Amino acid sequence: MLLKLYNTKTKSLSDIKNFSDTKVYACGPTVYNYAHIGNLRTYIFEDLLIKSLRLLKYNVNYAMNITDIGHLTGDFDEGEDKVVKAARERGLTVYEISRFFTEAFFDDCAKLNIVYPDKVLVASEYIASMIEVVKVLEQNGFTYFVNGNVYFDTSRFNGYGQMAGINLNNFGRSSVSRVEIDLSKKNKSDFVLWFTNSKFKDQEMKWDSPWGFGYPSWHLECAAMNLDYFKSTLDIHLGGVDHVGVHHINEIAIAECYLNKMWCDMFVHGEFLIMEDEKMSKSNNNFITIKDLESDGFSPLDFRYFCLTAHYRTQLKFTFSNLRACKIARENMLNKLTFFYSSLSQFDMALLNKNCENIESVSENKYYNNFLEKIAFDLSIPQALALLWDIVKDDDLSALLKLLLAFKFDEVLSLGLKEGVLREIERDRVNIDDTMHSLIEERRLAKLRKDFKRADEIREYFRSKGFVLIDTEEGTKVKRG
């Protein structure tokens, strides 16, 4: 089954046809602060895509970058380096800041069940590749050098800005009020490839180059690391919708002028998480971290569930009341699945522990096929989540099949369902003493002679002690209430 995604380049749904070596790249974090939940919504969307591709039998090679240098406080070459600014404010070196927040980012990802990339590309480790890309662009006439910096000449690239629908004659007009005008540029849309000391005197991370001692731009970093790792073309480039109008069109310009051919088939963008009708932003100081949510009593997986309730191309408004509703829904789901699990026979438990794909009832089940169709059609995750609830409520499905399907769906949804159920089962595990054994046997005999009053009395006795009796084909099980 082919997966279709909305391609920002073509403004239409496109099939992903490369099954054998699907090359996917995601713009990772600039590691100068904790990732906020707006950032993490994008990484959850990207995680859902990677897992959907793999469930649909694509052989995915997934890379993500870490920007530890050269990302300015503005996208138009203005401001100062975010990492340098954070290091100065905290009294640390840029290397200490980068290392600390890289670890913090992947810690948050682990809490959210976000898959670790096949390759993490750290910008400061690819300086030689970046310099090589600029050399080739320079040789081919796409750059100019002025006032100590190497610029990309956008007028030399006919396709510049097409993905964003940019008219070069009007470029930057809507942003003039907030952009520091760089008089060194030939065109407003031109951007720096390599900075030297002439631009920012306090830049700590610098390298020697043919153009002087300096550092690369954010746009050059992503393009050069891609070209180094994947060697040539790319199937899917992922990122937030805020990257469409500057960063990603600059990446395209660099890569296509370097390769002299089309670089990436498909660009896919996730929409904003918003608060009070504004996107969440560190620069606006209106952001919430995973640690903040945990301090308020939420599991990171409550937030993941919340993100699953909206399509990735739809803005999602964050409120704590909505998050609480998702927390309740996720806990209800776990409670229902735990109940199903506790009712399984030993034989069914053995089946459950096998790989779901080896059980015919799953692969041929209408719910499973419907789930594949949902994720394959532009990641229709809210509808896929609704199918999970349909399974739980379907009285025609056995407890075993419900669990098999739920756990299979969770290979993509990643709500920690199996782990959560097993944790609840272990928590509810009861060591049954002789008195309990005697009462359970007495209740069994009472039911056989149709003395339901006595059977109910024994059930109520257990309940008064904080236990619940569950009748199964193999006898009565006891769990904590």
UniProtKB/Swiss-Prot annotation:
CDD domains: CysRS_core (cd00672). Its main location: cytoplasm. One of its GO terms (cellular component) is cytosol. Disulfide bonds: none annotated. It is found in: Cytoplasm. A motif ('HIGH' region) lies at residues 29-39. The keyword Aminoacyl-tRNA synthetase applies. ATP binds at K282. It is an enzyme of class 6 (ligase). Monomer. HAMAP family: Cys_tRNA_synth. This is Cysteine--tRNA ligase. It comes from Borrelia hermsii (strain HS1 / DAH).
